[in-house]
Amino acid sequence: MPRRQDIQKILLLGSGPIVIGQACEFDYSGTQACKALREEGYEVVLVNSNPATIMTDPETADRTYIEPLTPELVEKVIARERPDALLPTMGGQTALNIAVALAKNGVLDQYNVELIGAKLPAIEKAEDRKLFNEAMDKIGVKVCPSGTASSLDESKAIARRIGTYPLIIRPAFTMGGTGGGIAYNQEEFEEMAQVGIDASPVSQILIDQSLLGWKEYELEVMRDLADNVVIICSIENIDPMGIHTGDSITVAPAQTLTDKEYQRLRDMAIKIIREIGVETGGSNIQFAVNPVNGDVVVIEMNPRVSRSSALSSKATGFPIAKMAAKLAVGYTLDEIRNDITKKTPASFEPTIDYVVTKVPRFAFEKFPGSEPVLTTQMKSVGEAMAIGRTFNESFQKALRSLETGRAGWGCDKAEKLPSGEQIRAQLRTPNPDRIFAVRHALQLGMSPEEIYELTAIDPWFLDKMQQLLEVEKFLKRTPLKQLTREQMYAVKRDGYSDRQIAFATKTTEDEVRAYRKELGVTPVYKTVDTCAAEFEAFTPYYYSTYEEETEVIPASKPKVMILGGGPNRIGQGIEFDYCCCHAAYALKGAGYETIMVNSNPETVSTDYDTSDRLYFEPLTKEDVLNIIEAENPVGIIVQFGGQTPLKLALPLQDYLRQVGNGSLVIGNGNEETAITDDQLPITKIWGTSPDSIDSAEDRERFEKILQKLNISQPPNGIARSYEDALIVAKRIGYPVVVRPSYVLGGRAMEIVYSDTELERYMTFAVQVEPEHPILIDKFLENAIEVDVDAIADHTGRVVIGGIMEHIEQAGIHSGDSACSLPSISLPPAVLNQIRTWTVQLAQELSVVGLMNIQFAVIGASSYSPQVYILEANPRASRTVPFVSKATGVPLAKLASLIMSGKTLEELNFTQEVIPSHIAVKEAVLPFNKFPGTDTILGPEMRSTGEVMGIDSDFGRAFAKAELGAGERLPLTGTVFVSMSDRDKSAAVPVVREFIDLGFKVMATFGTRRVLLENGLNVELVLKLHEGRPHVIDAIKNQKIQLIINTPSGEEAQTDARLIRRTGLAYKIPIITTIAGAKATVAAIRSMQNTTLDVKTIQEYCPNF
């Protein structure tokens, strides 16, 4: 059937901010869907609150609303735009839940909007656990013994019926297993059941008999209107059931299924998608298989594009989201061409002749108090994927792609083996490092059978790991120079990196590389082509392996290589991927052939049509040098991917200089390209030189530059031991901020108020980076922090991209603080001082491209405000997408063109753009996933994502940002206030404003006394140890609608922490800073006076 002619305008919902369980795979799917629908001539309207997405760029959709994803505001977009159809399957669980809400409350009928991609009955049948089980029963597919409950009493009755613990609890209409878990006894069960009912938007949980130890598989399935069904990919979890699939190491295609078993799953999947009624698009279906008797049960189905669809798309080259969008508007699979082969139709199931491994990345170290144990609730913050010809190769490449300091599956550092008892405990309890515990167990001589008993990891995988250990033993007893060409090939085919070979043979990585090349052992690159080389592939999407024949095709244009950011982690996420994509778009447009190198399957940068060539490879020195030697680019861009490529800049430069041929120099595309002996272009690192980057990162060098320019910074010092630290702290006075040098995301950074706290920090933190000293700065209390993004060209011209004023005071990591652009309270003199220093510093560091500087301002409203510089980063920062959306200036695109030799004048960007509207960025924090952790903000970054609120008034913009971040601010009710002594007097005017807005106020004894002295009528509430009813009772009885609680030093921490955790559990907004409280007052006032309206980014920034 050709495309539908009866619809013209389609509304697409994004997934909002990046949260655990719902990350940038939905930017990838949404961007693909927008492109596909516009190609077909439809007008596309998009709603998404996340500014750090390619999807919200003004050119992706026709009309783009960066507005909170709530049913109320999406209804306003519908009323304004009058779309014919709503496509809800591209924005994860968020979009699906909003679509269901709008269908049920009659909005879609009122405005005559049709749901496409998945109809309401299909969504409900797949998502409502009771309906799903009934549907499976009807078609004879087994489900796990289970029941659905909406109350604690119903839950207990089901537990009695099932009869045995452990039991699995899964809330309906949630993603990433939010609110779920495994209960091993009745007490745990009752607690988890209540949490699960509260977490589900429909207050419903499914209670399953535990299938712990069963094998888990997923099939990615597509169906069209003509009832054609294709299986795109099978995925096998190495970890058994009981661990969320997002936290499990997974392999595609499934490795341990016999053909007969695979056909069984395939037949079931086809029956399921037909019965549920997903007519047009993709679904992800999860199965459990009993390894003892082969029993199969279906676990669940997602009637939408999911995290696994992004992985399947990257693993096979089949663009699921794009195809799903086309199916949603009436095409059938046989009518759509495969983009990669250009010959085969989409109804041909992909075939692959390689193995793909995905490994999750965790961030437990960011959440002290949370246990690093994996369950059915997803906790990973990112993932890396690798492709190899064999499982061993793909597995080792994936582990080194994670960037956690490992070069593969061990054999990369001296290890002290744990005891047998410790290893058994690590194997029994699923945790992020269990795969390395398997290695230790095999090294201690534990049999694969015993490891299987403890882990339920399939013996096939354990056998492969045993083989890897044999290779390692062989390497350790063979001197490097005695390895023959065949042996070197065999070792590399097992995925061993040069660094691992160097460790085993007691040599260096560079020696291994030189000897390997001498033997003529270099990687070749194979194509991901959807058809196992049956047809010619037209899209250069490559992975490395060690065989004879390469499939890299020569190019006629000069090539530029962009190094991506690798797996998402806290501190380095989608914002950097956004910059890499923009570099690819801009340089492609300028006539270069762009090469993207990245290992993250969730992102737009690893879409096969973002760059001209895609290398799905680990971002290590070895892998990147191999690609440089295969492609000979004229330029390499390292300043867009965060810390990952920056760390590679100096090693790449050093190696290429040593090798002779002088084949790497620093510079920009504006010089003449020299030709070396063998007529290949010289490869240059484009943009700011690695030396300048180092002089901004290296504290001592940076301080000299600031002294030369007469720029003030807070009193500070450097310590390499606890004794050093004490001397520095005494000299500059407490409180101080302590942190290791060279970190991103404020890793291991703290504010310290005393000698004892300093001692505790030094004992813990020096282990973080032993070769780098600890930096100690005077902590500027109550300072306003300011972030500046600027851009500079090779002529020395500097233009400010945007000046953002933080809403939380200095001391809270800039990635976790809300901020406003333009500034809302800083006087012109302060802003001008900031501008002057930014320009001077960019010129002194010879910045070419982007730069981010953080300042602190003390006494902004006094007669003599003081400005201090906190740090400077001559690279793209995580605020670039936000600034670009707020001002309408595509900074990353401009910066990449500047690196190619263009000037700001040529690009027509010569002065700062100050918007007439207000944009507020707010951070989104994952505390609900880490129940043991305090919700307090500090200098270590913990947010996973961000949202943007945009309006003509600060109060409304802040209200939208809070709403987008999932905080519904109350308009009436009671505010609970408990302040540290430092903040009590500053709280008086804020509390007065809350009373003026009609709120009642409750406070603890000390805070109340100060408020009463200032003539404010405040009710007393008891602290926990003062008797009942206390503040926690008031929260649980829903007598409090808003909590303002600023943390004090060490004392009373337990009380305050419990108050904050309880507030979080009861979904009460919690504010932990005075500045945040002031912004909240402005937001509530504006919402009491006016309703929130919606407007497109194209209207806010018409010149974008």
Curated annotation (Swiss-Prot):
SMART domains assigned to the protein according to its UniProt record, in alphabetical order: CPSase_L_D3 (SM01096), MGS (SM00851)
Origin: domain of life: Bacteria
Domain MGS-like: 967-1104
Binding site for Mn(2+) 4: E871, N873
Binding residue positions for Mg(2+) 3: Q854, E871
Secreted keyword on record: no
Region (Oligomerization domain): 404-552
Residues at which Mn(2+) 3 binds: Q854, E871
Binding annotation for Mg(2+) 2: E300, N302
GO biological process: 'de novo' UMP biosynthetic process; glutamine metabolic process; L-arginine biosynthetic process
Pfam families to which the protein is assigned, alphabetical: CPSase_L_D2 (PF02786), CPSase_L_D3 (PF02787), MGS (PF02142)
Cofactor: Mg(2+); Mn(2+)
HAMAP family reported in the protein's UniProt record: CPSase_L_chain_A, CPSase_L_chain_B
This protein's name: Carbamoyl phosphate synthase large chain
